């Protein structure tokens, strides 16, 4: 608790100055085709903003996410560009590098981020969810464009609801695939608003 409080107290001046399978679900041919395209995405880079709201804290951070099958790196920065958190995930576990050069490791990335910052973010599932692929979801719904509208997932006995409110067409392998531009994650009184401003796919 002391480490977490100290972490955000040190950041406060900076803020002031500036594959599990898919669930059984009725699907259309269009969704199956879209899902197949998403499954071909092995690596991506996503740049955007994350807003975090809970009874304990509110944070607005920029993020840069570089993901590949071998390693995933998620970096949060303040609006001044100061690195707040640098998370690296591999099949062997997770490592966090903080703004003051602390390095902490754990088997579970979500637990490590929460321990250090108090932020509850299901980062291990987000690599699929942020591209609109409901891997591991307990249930999901499609919109009229046959892309993901929402999904539900129980994690550690807590129900997460993810809503997709906007998509953007992104070039991938000489074709266009719609990817999420705005989504929100809700778990009881915790809410995360994610806006992806730039996608790069490989």
Swiss-Prot record:
<dbReference type="GO" id="GO:0009279">
    <property type="term" value="C:cell outer membrane"/>
</dbReference>
<keyword id="KW-0732">Signal</keyword>
<dbReference type="Pfam" id="PF03550">
    <property type="entry name" value="LolB"/>
</dbReference>
<dbReference type="InterPro" id="IPR029046">
    <property type="entry name" value="LolA/LolB/LppX"/>
</dbReference>
<comment type="similarity">
    <text>Belongs to the LolB family.</text>
</comment>
<keyword id="KW-0564">Palmitate</keyword>
<keyword id="KW-0449">Lipoprotein</keyword>
<dbReference type="InterPro" id="IPR004565">
    <property type="entry name" value="OM_lipoprot_LolB"/>
</dbReference>
<protein>
    <recommendedName>
        <fullName>Outer-membrane lipoprotein LolB</fullName>
    </recommendedName>
</protein>
<dbReference type="GO" id="GO:0044874">
    <property type="term" value="P:lipoprotein localization to outer membrane"/>
</dbReference>
<keyword id="KW-0143">Chaperone</keyword>
<feature type="lipid moiety-binding region" description="S-diacylglycerol cysteine">
    <location>
        <position position="19"/>
    </location>
</feature>
<feature type="lipid moiety-binding region" description="N-palmitoyl cysteine">
    <location>
        <position position="19"/>
    </location>
</feature>
<keyword id="KW-0813">Transport</keyword>
<comment type="function">
    <text>Plays a critical role in the incorporation of lipoproteins in the outer membrane after they are released by the LolA protein.</text>
</comment>
<comment type="subunit">
    <text>Monomer.</text>
</comment>
<keyword id="KW-0472">Membrane</keyword>
<dbReference type="GO" id="GO:0015031">
    <property type="term" value="P:protein transport"/>
</dbReference>
<feature type="signal peptide">
    <location>
        <begin position="1"/>
        <end position="18"/>
    </location>
</feature>
<keyword id="KW-0653">Protein transport</keyword>
<keyword id="KW-0998">Cell outer membrane</keyword>
